């Protein structure tokens, strides 16, 4: 949300600091700034504001970026990298969905790398080259060094992907004020420019990812109600649909890398022309001299991509459900991303939301404009009425508790930055260490969530079970990066960890984690109840058996027999999977041992008072 506060170090400065907003996109990238109170996108020497997110490695240290690299893509596909954003923070095992890519993938340290004529190159390095060009463009246009930048990322980027983006910026010589979710950046641009109020949906279909955000806009306040999306769906998939159609029309298959790249470029061009005209003709000559000639109509294109269009609406429904809203509650729909220029997208969005979507701002530029506004604020250039934008985390962050349960500490869709704390205690007498397992996900059992990190808190003073107080704090910063601290309250002993996963979630995992939380909600609740009852039953059994060992002599034979029988029934119930049966057996044992507990208390008091004089007791 937007609040009347400022981040540390972002106060008003006596002189204006140069700051930019960068949309590091899958297909194109842009850089924008606030100049003379106007937010503008900066162009190159030829006046072009869009920089193709394409990098070509020539060897001997030579590199081409942007239009030059894109022009050579067809003839040198193995060394020319497009849509590299899809590989940020990913491991080799995550690339199953990227069949057909012409690159030579190799496993790197925590992230996939590309084998090129210039050696092994990581997606971070490729992204850094794009950022360098944007940085140089801004420096030349603004006439000075940059104080920093706000860089946008898809809302569904996890910690590893966000960290990879920050690493790329560092390589490019950029100070990152913060990372900002792309749909949220668009909302900043639309909300501030139009002073709009109400609940809005931001439909963001970029080259490689799809995001939907539901935001509540009021005067001076932007609150993100919910986010959802598909990290493996974007304009590239629509290009591929045209590509597959062209292959089918020509009867060809098994094209060489260069021919496949050439045809994919032609497919993208045809798709873009169909946004302006009703037909597009493809006429492409392959390396063997054969030609692929076909005319694609807008209607046929709509049929080819109907499944993809429909696929975008599933996350939209989930986001509305998460926000507790109906379609009628949405005042307007903002379109973001060049892919939203397609008529089939605009028609589908209009039909779903029963209203014409907003297209006042250029969908290619709107994200960069919003990022520039935020950068201007964080640079300290905006005096009076400053606002701060807070995003939300897309997946819940939790901790493993006894029985393999996931205790959610920061629920999904919580606004960030945020700090949440919860107290835990020890399970055994004299316990001096505790293992902290940090997890991410929506399921009730840790086995169904994603493990982020493990660390230990040592040096806990020996106490009776349940006496120690361990406070676990989760801090998520404005970039979505997590720090976890565990501290024992009486001694002050502390342990902490910064969570930076070695690589990110696969495309399938990101979509599955939220989907499964809905599909298995009832089963998960039953599983959680079962584990909770088993944990409580185990505690009761241990306590009862310990009491019988120490003070069993306080019971009659008949009373002892009742408690032993109760223990046997509870242990038998624990071998099954009926949580209610375990609870009933535990309740029965508790009730049967109530009188015994009272006698033990009386016995302990009597033993403590034996031999004491009244004066020593203050009587």
Curated annotation (Swiss-Prot):
Entries under Pfam families matching the protein: HSP70
One GO biological process term: iron-sulfur cluster assembly
PROSITE patterns: HSP70_1, HSP70_2, HSP70_3
Keywords: ATP-binding, Chaperone, Nucleotide-binding
Alphabetized GO MF terms: ATP binding; ATP hydrolysis activity; ATP-dependent protein folding chaperone; unfolded protein binding
Cystine bridges: none
Family per similarity comment: Belongs to the heat shock protein 70 family.
Physiological role: Chaperone involved in the maturation of iron-sulfur cluster-containing proteins. Has a low intrinsic ATPase activity which is markedly stimulated by HscB.
Protein name (record): Chaperone protein HscA homolog
Source organism of the structure: Methylococcus capsulatus (strain ATCC 33009 / NCIMB 11132 / Bath)
